[in-house]
Amino acid sequence: AEMARQLGIPAEVLDAAATAALDPSVTMDVCGSVYFPKDCHLSPSRFIAALESELRTLGVQFLWETDVHGFEVEGSSIRALKTSAGLVEADEFVLTGGVWSAELARHLGLRIPMQAGKGYSLTLASPRQLRARCSICTEARLAVTPMDGALRFGGTMEMSGLDESITQRRVRGITRAVPEYFPAFAESDFADIQP
């Protein structure tokens, strides 16, 4: 908390009773917490939907299910994208290919030091208890986020390139950690959930 305050981030050290008072509808097994009153979170899907809607009002065109194969370049400027839907011309381009940005940039002779990673999370659509606030259980490397009536439990990040396989040990780490901090939950709550 002290380090956060030195950086200008409001933070308060709370004992177990004060932690419980912040979210009285949820049972937590903790000695205390650090509360960040200005902390916030969002629903990624709602954020992206709102962003897309706003961009459309500004005249942005989206080409879904379209692969970029390369670029047409004049001098030091990109003139067009070569895509599975044909050439796409524009005055300016923004490279937002996520983990594929480095590969796309290579077509332009650029090197972007980027490596794909995957985070693990499990979401309970109808949780036994719904937290009002986010939590980070640092010892277990567990993030807990309420999202539109659901509760998401996020675990570790794995730097794995584009490998989409699931490491079951990491999934078990999440399902075992949740009841340690939130006794109303059990590992069996996650039995039918796919990461």
Go through each PLM region and give its residues.
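Dinucleotide-binding Rossmann-like beta1-alpha1 core, especially the glycine-rich loop
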Residues: 1-16
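Active-site substrate-recognition segment that forms the wall
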Residues: 70-78, 86-195
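Short loop/edge segments at beta-strand edges and connector loops
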Residues: 15-16, 64-66, 189-194
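Helical element adjacent to the flavin cofactor pocket in flavoenzyme catalytic cores
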Residues: 2-3, 26-92
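Proline-centered flexible-loop/turn and helix-kink motifs
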Residues: 5, 24, 183-186
